Amino acid sequence: MYRKFETELAGRKLTVETGRVAELANGDAIIHYGDTVVMVNVTASKEPREGIDFFPLSVDYEEKLYAVGKIPGSFQKREGKPADKAILTSRAIDRPIRPLFPKDFRNDVCVVATVLSVEQDNSPEVCAMIGASVALSISDIPFGGPTAAVNVGYVDGQIVINPTVAQREHSRLKLTVAGTMEKVTMIEAGADEIPNDTMLDCIKAGHEEIKKLCKFIEGIKEEVGKPKFEYVSFATDKDVYAEIKENFKERMYQDVQAVDKEVRDANMDKLAEDIQAYFVEKYGEEETEAKSTEIANSIHDLEKECVREMIFKEHKRPDGRRIDEIRPLSCEVGVLPRVHGSAIFTRGQTQVLSVVTLGTKSEEQELDGLDEEESKRYMHQYNFPSYSVGEARPSRGPGRREIGHGALAEKALVPVIPSEDEFPYTIRVVSEVLSSNGSTSQASICGSTLALMDAGAPIKKPVAGISTGLVTSKENPDEYVMLTDIQGIEDFFGDMDFKVGGTKDGITAIQVDIKNDGLTYDIIKEAFERTKVARDYILDEIMKPQIAEPRAELSKYAPRIITTTINVDKIKDVIGPGGKMINKIIDATGVKVDIEEDGRVCIYTDDAENGKKALKMIEDIAKDIEVGKVYDGKVTRIMNFGAFVDIGGGREGLLHISKISNKRVEKVEDVLAVGDEIKVKVYEIDNQDRINLTMKDLEENKENKEEHVEE
C-alpha cells in the first residue's frame, strides 16, 4: 500500500514514500530531500545461514552517475566496482544499525541504497542512512530501531545541521552522527582542530535532530509497519555453557591473561582442545560432534565473560595494564633509503610502516563520483596483509575495512597538509600493517605524520591517534569502565572502539564503532578527555624526540619543483598546436610540466639545470613581444621573399627581403643563411598576430650585412 510522509529537517522538507516500488522486498523506502532522491530496499533470507557465528548483514550503497547527469568514464560506459566514497557510505549505513539486530539472529539481511538523483546541497549519504532505518523499521525483519542520521558543520562559530555546499566550503567540521531516541550509535568526523567541548556540543546538536527523526520514523512504523517474523535463535546452549563454565572458567580466567598475543592464542587453543577432549570422554565422539557448534560458541562466550569481568570488576586488563595505560611505544624515521619519506610506528604488538611519495600535479587521484570534487591531491592508502595477524591467505586487494581505515588516517592528516601554493606536490602515503594487535589505523596516523616530516613536507602540526574502548555492566548499562589504547581482544569483546586523531590543539578525525545499544554524552565526553591525554603523551614523549619538525630539505630522490605564473592568454602559446611547444620543451629538458587554468606553471625535475632551462623556454614563449624592441634572433628558414627568424620561445617573425638592409638585396641567401644569429627589431604585429621584423639601421648587424653584400 502506497503511503507518503513528510517532515522538516534543517529547514528543508524531507519526504518518505513507501509501498511504491520493490513490492517483493521485505521493506522499502524512497527518501526525497530537496532534489536528492535515494531508494532503499531491504530483504532477508527465509532460513538462517548454518555454520556461522556472526550476523550476516550486507549493505550496499550504489552511486548511479545518472543521478548527477554524468556518463561513466569507463570503456563500457557503465558503473563498475564501488568507489571508495560509496564503500565508506556503506560502512556508515552499516555501523549504526548492526548492533540493533538480535544477537542470536543468523538470517542473511541485505540493505541496498540506490542514489537516483542528487542535489549537492542535500546529502544522499544521510538520506540513505535514514532510508535504511525506515525500510528496516517497517519491514518484518527483526530490528530494534529506528535510528537516524544527520551531518553537522561548524561555520563561523555556529553549529549547522546538514550544511549546504556553500556552508561546507567554510565549515571547520564535517561530522556525521547517527543514533536512536536515547543514545548515539555512530560518529564519523573530519575536523580542523576542533576542541573537545565544541565537538561534544556539535554531537549533541546533531542528536537533537536525530531524536525528531526517530520519532517521525516511529510514526511511520506504527502506521504501515509489518509484524516481525519469528526466527530460529542461535543463542548459546545454556546447558553446554554452564558445564564449560563450571569446569573451565577458573583456568580460562588465567589463560586469557598474557602480555603476548601469541601466548594467549596458544593458551586458548590448548584450552579448546582440552574442553573438546572432556566432552568426548564424557559424552562420546558422536554426541560431541553434534554439539561442536554449541561448544565453540560457549567457549567464545565464556572467554568474553572472563575478559569483561576482569576489566569491569578488577580494573585489570588481559595484558596486565592499568585501564588508562598505553602499550609500549616506539618509532623510527628514515627507515628506507630511496623513498621520499618513511617511518615505522610500533605500539605493543601493533606495527605499521608508512611511506611517502611526492608526485606531480598530473598524478592527483581522479574522482568519478557524485560529488563536485574531481581530484584529490593528498591520499592515504592502508594495507592489511594476512601475515600481520599470522595467517596464511592470499591478498585480493583492499577490502572495505582497509578502505575505511585508510580514509580515517587520511582524514586525520588533511587539516595539517600544506596548501598547494605552499607545497605544490601530490602526496601519497601508504601504510603497511606489519603486525596487528589492535589500533592499526591509529598507528597509521602516527606513522603518516612521521613519514611526512621525514619527507620534508611542511605539515602545519604533528598528528597522533589513539583509541579507547568500553566495557559496560550487564546489570546496569550506565556503569562502565573505559580503556585507553585497546588491543585486539579488548576491541573484540568490548562494547566500543572510539578512535580519535588530532593535534595538541584539537581533534582532526573521529570514527566510532559500537556493539551495544549506543553511547551517552558522558561516555563520549570521557572518551574525548582520555584520548586528549594519550595523544599529547604520544606527540610529546614518543614522536617529538624522534623528529620534532619537518626536514628542511626534501629527499634527493624527490622531484624538485619550479613554479612560475604566465598570462592566461599565453597558455595556448606555451602548449602549442597539438601540444607541439610543450612537448618540445619536455623532450629538450626531460622535465614534467603542469599548467593550470589560472596560468600557474609547475616544472618538476630531478636536475636543477634542466629545470632552469625549461623555465626560460616557457618564459620566453609567454613573454609579450613588444613593437620597437630589439631581439636576439636565429634564422630558421630562407624563402625567396625573406627569412623566418626565431626570436625566442618558439616565436617566429618574418624578416622581409626589403627589411634586411638599407641597401638593395637581390637574394636573401646573399646576406643570410639558416642558423645565422642576428639582431632584429619588431616593427609591427599585424591584426593576425603575425610578427614582422627588420634589420635596418641596427648597428649590430651592419658589419655582417656589408660583408654579405660585398660578396
Regions found by a protein language model. Give the residues of each.
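Conserved phosphate/anionic-ligand binding catalytic regions in large, soluble enzymes, centered on
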Residues: 27-29, 122-140, 333-356, 437-457, ...
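Long, basic N-terminal domains or extensions that often function
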Residues: 1-232
